Design a protein with these regions (language model features):
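Primarily the internal scaffold of c-type cytochrome electron-transfer domains
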Residues: 2-184, 188-200, 205-209, 223-244
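Extracellular Ig-like/FN3 beta-sandwich strand-entry sites
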Residues: 211-213
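Conserved glycine-centered beta->alpha loop in an early N-terminal alpha/beta scaffold
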Residues: 216
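Beta-strand-rich extracellular modules
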Residues: 219-221
Length: 244
């Protein structure tokens, strides 16, 4: 309604529609009450749809376009948003038309497990007297995770003795903090722990016993804080059991 690159207006009508075709394709100044398709399609829709600036209209609120501008697998690799989130597929553009190669409109992202698993590499091992977990942002053109502050990547390490008794538990959370997580009267900018594109975060946990077992898990949280066992909001991506 405000145009590509402009801050969206708060909408008071048709809230039940959510995002529609017009959210991205609408062009300022066009009277769609007279739209009949056909030749109108050439002029009725914004030609900049699908550009990074188009996506940034809404997604810049979470800093994702800024992250992309410095990302090893993003702008620096010549990739744009639609390369990952609107891949080319063969499908009919409209009912009754023959399939052809066009952009997918399913927008795979953090709710899509296959897309999520392409984003990272995970390694867990016992090195000397500590557990070392490495999480690498191997394929994302922005931070991992990004978008809403609710998103989180969590590494959990549990150390047990030879009898299975829990000795230690450590959790590393990669996220951008909520305002409620800042220090009282904090006047400095918050510092996130999201993993930048192409970078690795380490989670190190010391071992204080001679032998036992380490349990390592990697969770993705669609909304944090949520329980690791929440079937809707949490997904266990990796699980390792390492004797030492």
């Amino acid at each position: 309604e405000t145009g590509i690159g402009m801050t969206p207006m708060q909408r008071w009508t048709d809230l039940e529609e959510g995002n529609t075709c017009m959210s991205c394709h609408g062009r300022a100044g066009v009277d769609y009450t007279t739209f009949v398709g056909g030749a109108d399609c050439k002029t009725a829709f914004d030609p900049d749809v699908g550009t990074v600036s188009s996506c940034a209209t809404c997604h810049r609120i979470a800093g994702t376009p800024d992250q992309w501008s410095r990302a090893e697998h993003g702008k620096l690799a010549g990739r744009v948003c639609i390369d990952c989130h609107m891949p080319l597929v063969e499908r009919p553009v409209a009912v009754g038309t023959a399939p052809r190669l066009v952009r997918s409109h399913t927008f795979p992202a953090s709710s899509n497990e296959a897309q999520l698993r392409r984003a990272y590499a995970y390694d867990a091992q016992v090195t000397g007297n500590e557990v070392v977990v490495r999480i690498t942002n191997k394929g994302v053109g922005h931070n991992f995770p990004t978008a809403n502050r609710q998103r989180g990547v969590e590494s959990l390490v549990v150390v047990r003795d030879r009898d299975g008794k829990e000795i230690a538990r450590s959790r590393l959370v990669c996220r951008y903090p909520y305002a409620s997580e800042l220090a009282p009267h904090q006047m400095t900018l918050p510092r996130g722990s999201q993993i930048p594109s192409g970078k690795t975060t380490e989670h190190r946990v010391p071992l204080t016993i001679a032998d036992g077992t380490v349990e390592c898990r990697l969770y993705f949280k669609l909304y944090r804080p949520s329980a690791d066992t929440d079937a809707d909001l949490a997904r266990c991506l990796e699980e390792r059991r390492i004797p030492f």
